């Protein structure tokens, strides 16, 4: 039986929070106004993002090359942010599911890059460059698609499709249902497949 401490210690969100707190303490000590420190930090940030984009594109190529057309059926619960009142039946292929999740992660990465660049270039803050360089590298290897297709981890437990929501702020509103009863019921009632 896994203890709560082990679960907490192995949780990627907990690790990210711990690393962020540690880096925030470091940023209070470092003088980011020195050009001898600022330019290498900018180069590090640009390099991490270029590598991240490259790995996302490489993962996309691998997914398309595998072309896994296994049918994946699940019921997506309605959440306050989805704008739907009822659950939605989804029938797709593993390939399309993986590509859609990878695209979602890619869009999140672009929003993070835009926010960080705005804070650095317009507002003049340098610490986000360090924080995002480290968290981007960590987040990339915590990405389910990268773990399955680049690191060749088996798609079991946490990596089983459809992926469980991360739990975050709205994760408690419902998980994706994959049990046969829920899927059959949704298919029969035709909850508008996508």
Curated annotation (Swiss-Prot):
Gene Ontology BP annotations: phosphate ion transport; protein insertion into ER membrane; protein targeting to ER
Signal peptide range in chain numbering: none
Membrane-crossing residue ranges in chain numbering: 43-63, 110-130
GO CC term, one of those recorded: endoplasmic reticulum membrane
Membrane topology of this protein: Multi-pass membrane protein
Pfam family, one: Pho88
Compartment(s): Endoplasmic reticulum membrane
Keywords annotated in UniProt: Endoplasmic reticulum, Membrane, Phosphate transport, Transmembrane, Transmembrane helix, Transport
Top-rank taxon: Eukaryota
Function: May function in a SRP (signal recognition particle) and GET (guided entry of tail-anchored proteins) independent pathway for targeting a broad range of substrate proteins to the endoplasmic reticulum. Involved in inorganic phosphate uptake. Also involved in telomere length regulation and maintenance.
Family per record: Belongs to the PHO88 family.
Name of the protein this chain belongs to: SRP-independent targeting protein 3 homolog
Organism: Schizosaccharomyces pombe (strain 972 / ATCC 24843)
Lineage, highest ranks first: Eukaryota, Fungi, Dikarya, Ascomycota, Taphrinomycotina
